[in-house]
């Protein structure tokens, strides 16, 4: 039997919204394979949908900067340990220096960016007594570039064609709010589509309908699925009567690419109380 850790149970609970006992049981049955556990829970109706792995648990800021000619832009995530330090003047100044260098020197590799600022980072850590990390760097080049920051925790950069700055800004704001994973439905990887198709087919077959009818039911569900995770298929947050794709079509524009960063995505802090709770629960198995 695979080792079912407290962290694994917690992640499954967060991604499915199911109860602790259901998550523990699903992981045991799936021998610790969290993705298989999610699929099985969805098929059985215990989980309607699964959130992406990882949760926001760190502090820090997202910064964006676009060159004066508007053709090159960078976005970075700079982490610290507490919200207090995230608002510190020295921390902010360090972030400004980092992103300015990334832009002006066209640095595209985060490890190279880290190496360039390691001495300054170490000095700042010693001064404020908190760990600091240049975690991520994203670059977009070409087209009409635009960015949007929602506070300091969510940042978006967009590259578009045939769009003005206002349209790009509105699309960036939509991305910040709606978290699309791909630009178009056709961009969704085949393995992601195949996995969801199998889940939906299994659910449809449970109704007792013939396979050909179940397949037709799944076709509609799959269109909805790919539409919900792709930018152009989502309903525009500022005018839900149309999709982002329809909005772009009205302006003769298209989105080339986008980057969305949120502080702490995928970083998890240990929570001892929850571990103790799961350990006690584990005695029932």
From Swiss-Prot:
Positions of transmembrane segments: none
Region (Involved in Mg(2+) ion dislocation from EF-Tu): 82-85
Pfam families in the record: EF_TS
Origin superkingdom: Bacteria
InterPro entries on file: EF-Ts_dimer_sf (IPR036402), Transl_elong_EFTs/EF1B (IPR001816), Transl_elong_EFTs/EF1B_dimer (IPR014039), Transl_elong_Ts_CS (IPR018101), UBA-like_sf (IPR009060)
Record-linked SUPFAM superfamilies: Elongation factor Ts (EF-Ts), dimerisation domain, UBA-like
One Gene Ontology molecular-function label: translation elongation factor activity
Main subcellular location: cytoplasm
Keyword terms of this UniProt record: Cytoplasm, Elongation factor, Protein biosynthesis
One Gene Ontology term, aspect cellular component: cytoplasm
Location of the protein in the cell: Cytoplasm
Gene3D superfamilies (UniProt xref): 1.10.286.20, DNA helicase RuvA subunit, C-terminal domain (1.10.8.10), Elongation factor Ts, dimerisation domain (3.30.479.20)
UniProt record similarity statement: Belongs to the EF-Ts family.
Function, in words: Associates with the EF-Tu.GDP complex and induces the exchange of GDP to GTP. It remains bound to the aminoacyl-tRNA.EF-Tu.GTP complex up to the GTP hydrolysis stage on the ribosome.
Protein name (record): Elongation factor Ts
Organism for this UniProt entry: Sodalis glossinidius (strain morsitans)
């Amino acid at each position: 039997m695979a080792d079912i850790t407290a962290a694994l149970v917690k992640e499954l609970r967060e991604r499915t919204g199911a109860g602790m006992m259901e998550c523990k049981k699903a992981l045991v049955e799936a021998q610790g394979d969290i993705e298989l556990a999610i699929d099985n829970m969805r098929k059985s109706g215990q989980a309607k949908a699964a959130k992406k792995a990882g949760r926001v648990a760190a502090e820090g800021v997202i910064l964006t900067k676009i060159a004066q000619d508007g053709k090159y832009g960078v976005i970075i995530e700079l982490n610290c340990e507490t919200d207090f330090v995230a608002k510190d003047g020295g921390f902010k100044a360090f972030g400004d220096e980092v992103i300015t260098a990334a832009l002006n020197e066209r640095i595209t590799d985060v490890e190279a960016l880290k190496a360039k600022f390691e001495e300054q980072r170490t000095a700042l850590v010693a001064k404020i007594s908190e760990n600091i990390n240049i975690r991520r760097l994203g670059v977009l080049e070409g087209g009409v570039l635009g960015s949007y920051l929602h506070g300091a925790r969510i940042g978006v950069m967009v590259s578009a064609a045939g769009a003005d700055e206002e349209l790009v800004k509105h699309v960036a704001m939509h991305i910040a709010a709606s978290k699309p994973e791909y630009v178009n439905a056709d961009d969704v990887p085949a393995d992601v589509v195949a996995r969801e198709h199998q889940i939906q087919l299994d659910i449809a077959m449970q109704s007792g309908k013939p396979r050909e009818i179940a397949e037709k039911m799944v076709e509609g569900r799959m269109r909805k699925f790919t539409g919900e995770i792709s930018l152009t298929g989502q309903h525009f947050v500022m005018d839900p009567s149309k999709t982002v794709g329809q909005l772009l079509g009205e302006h003769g524009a298209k989105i080339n690419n986008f980057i969305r960063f949120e502080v702490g995505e995928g970083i998890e802090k240990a929570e001892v109380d929850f571990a103790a709770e799961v350990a006690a629960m584990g005695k029932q198995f």
